[in-house]
């Protein structure tokens, strides 16, 4: 397993350390190789929002759509990218922290989002405990994979 984990690399790789799973809700931390501190999340919606914010901050993978609305509402504030390089341009110069060895209390997933197109994400999700890699073509499918794998651990029908 360690050999397969050591080969797991992407500049936008996010680790999802699941510490608690109950009734389809996940709680844990998001980690990445460019920051030593983790970002806590409380539920799947919070997880998705924080992952989206991280991708926007990196400007990678680039999104193909922007939020819009016909009525006034609180607008999502995209991180200020003025004067900053995109992640692929600066990844070689950033300090990197090891994340592959970190584990969640219940489960660990590493997510490589390759594209953010058609208002959703596409990529691969790697389940550390099962040594399994699953492709996903939408955020919903990614969440379904995570839920299925977590229910498998609890002995529920997947």
Positions of PLM-derived features:
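Short aromatic-glycine-(Arg/Gly/Cys) micro-motifs in beta-strand/loop hairpins
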Residues: 19-35, 114-130
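Mixed-charge, glycine-accented linear interaction segment located at domain edges/termini
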Residues: 38, 42, 48-56, 122-158
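N-terminal leader and targeting sequences that precede the mature domain
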Residues: 14-18, 25, 37-41, 46
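Intrinsic disorder/low-complexity detector
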Residues: 1-16, 24, 51-119, 148-158
């Amino acid at each position: 397993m360690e050999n397969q984990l050591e080969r797991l690399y992407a500049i936008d790789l996010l680790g999802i350390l699941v510490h608690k799973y109950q009734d389809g809700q996940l709680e844990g931390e998001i980690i990445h190789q460019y920051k030593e501190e983790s970002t806590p999340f409380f539920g799947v919606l919070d997880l998705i929002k924080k992952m989206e914010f991280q991708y926007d901050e990196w400007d990678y993978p680039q999104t193909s759509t922007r939020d819009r609305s016909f009525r006034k509402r609180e607008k999502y504030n995209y991180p200020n990218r003025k004067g900053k390089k995109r992640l692929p341009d600066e990844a070689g110069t950033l300090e990197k922290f090891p994340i592959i060895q970190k584990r969640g209390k219940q489960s660990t997933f590493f997510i490589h989002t390759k594209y953010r197109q058609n208002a959703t994400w596409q990529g691969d999700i790697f389940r550390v405990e099962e040594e399994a890699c699953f492709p996903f073509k939408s955020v919903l499918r990614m969440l379904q994979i995570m839920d299925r794998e977590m229910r498998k651990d609890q002995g529920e029908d997947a």
